[in-house]
Amino acid sequence: MKITQLTTYRVPPRWMFLRIETDEGLIGWGEPVVEGHARAVQAAVHELEPYLIGQDPARINDLWQVMYRAGFYRGGAVFMSAIAGVDQALWDIKGKALGVPVYQLLGGLVRDRMRTYGWVGGDRPADVIDGIRQRVDAGFTHFKLNGCEELGIIDSSRAVDAAVARVAQIRAAFGNTVEFGLDFHGRVSVAMAAVLIKELEYLRPLFIEEPVLAEQAEHYPKLAAKTHLPLAAGERMYSRFEFKRVLAAGGIAILQPDLSHAGGISECLKIAAMAEAHDVAIAPHCPLGPIALASCLHVDYVSWNATLQEQGMGMHYNRGGEVLDYVLNPQDFRLDNGFIAPFTKPGLGVEINEALVLERSRDCPDWRNPVWRHADGSVAEW
């Protein structure tokens, strides 16, 4: 079997799908994208074509190493996301060729279902209580929300009090019948993260995500030493080599690799194993589409230390396209009290509605995250 063609489709709301075709008619799908930089990833995918066309898609490990090493320069969000989408599609082809789900190729199940969580509240968290009630009615017990709005490098007690009051309302309304993570989204400086975490600790959120930006990772162990709350990070780390340094330094209790950013299934399986060796959980990052979610779940199903799976159904970003819009088998993503059962179809288990993908890709707007500014006019972290 040989790879014959790579085709990319940018689709709403902010995703990109990759279709890899073979000379035997088997098709594999991947989801290579960096939100807000889809065109850059699209170009990177097609720059990889000379390493892929005419090659055997079953040689996933070799093709991954060629893509990563042959071009000399490597790493970063755009390049590793391009590799990630190709890798997902190659696993999809291999599973289809052998007639088994990808998790069987990775050694088989370690669990019978995977707990997922949904988002509430939006970019600037609002209507959180109503959002949680809707999720509870749908059977969820675990959620995530942004822990704060934009914060200055040193900010006011009022901003801290507002963030704490929001979380206190959740505990007052629901007690400990729900669990929630708080995403600082890299909006918070080291100094303000220490203040916020201390003030929030008594409310016992499940974890604090991206307490500071990944480029400030040397502060993770310092922040962890000041709290009993688990710290989570990883969505803006792109290879096992970046995760290696974070694991060695300590401080992070939950790694959150993104299967569409951090080299795909092949790389994230290694990251999960590295995390397990350090007694660290994984909870893959996935505010994306169905192929990314399926890829995450296959890693979750075979990784003992997978604890939670983010999923973007009903997420505030999904204007113009929902996670299951593009699939012909939405029943296989059915949520049962927040859990998703292992897929039974071969490959990734996602049947893509190619006609709809083609239609919506013809006039897909470019998605950009908003540019926020502080009161003094300086740019704020989103």
Curated annotation (Swiss-Prot):
Q: In which pathway does it act?
A: Carbohydrate acid metabolism; D-galactonate degradation; D-glyceraldehyde 3-phosphate and pyruvate from D-galactonate: step 1/3
Q: What Pfam families does this protein map onto?
A: MR_MLE_C (PF13378), MR_MLE_N (PF02746)
Q: Where is this site: Increases basicity of active site His?
A: 258
Which residue positions are annotated as catalytic?
185, 285
Q: Does the keyword Lyase apply?
A: yes
Q: Which reaction does it catalyse?
A: D-galactonate = 2-dehydro-3-deoxy-D-galactonate + H2O
- Print the keywords alphabetically: Lyase, Magnesium, Metal-binding
Q: Which domain of life is it from?
A: Bacteria
GO biological process terms held by the UniProt record: amino acid catabolic process; D-galactonate catabolic process
Cofactor binding annotation: Binds 1 Mg(2+) ion per subunit.
Leading EC class: lyase
Q: Which PROSITE patterns match?
A: MR_MLE_1 (PS00908), MR_MLE_2 (PS00909)
Q: Does the keyword Magnesium apply?
A: yes
What GO annotations for molecular function exist for this entry?
A: galactonate dehydratase activity; magnesium ion binding
Question: Where is Mg(2+) bound in this sequence?
Answer: 183, 209, 235
Q: Where is this site: Transition state stabilizer?
A: 310
Cross-referenced HAMAP family? Galacton_dehydrat
Q: State the function annotated in the UniProt record.
A: Catalyzes the dehydration of D-galactonate to 2-keto-3-deoxy-D-galactonate.
The text of the family note is:
Belongs to the mandelate racemase/muconate lactonizing enzyme family. GalD subfamily.
For this entry, the protein name equals D-galactonate dehydratase
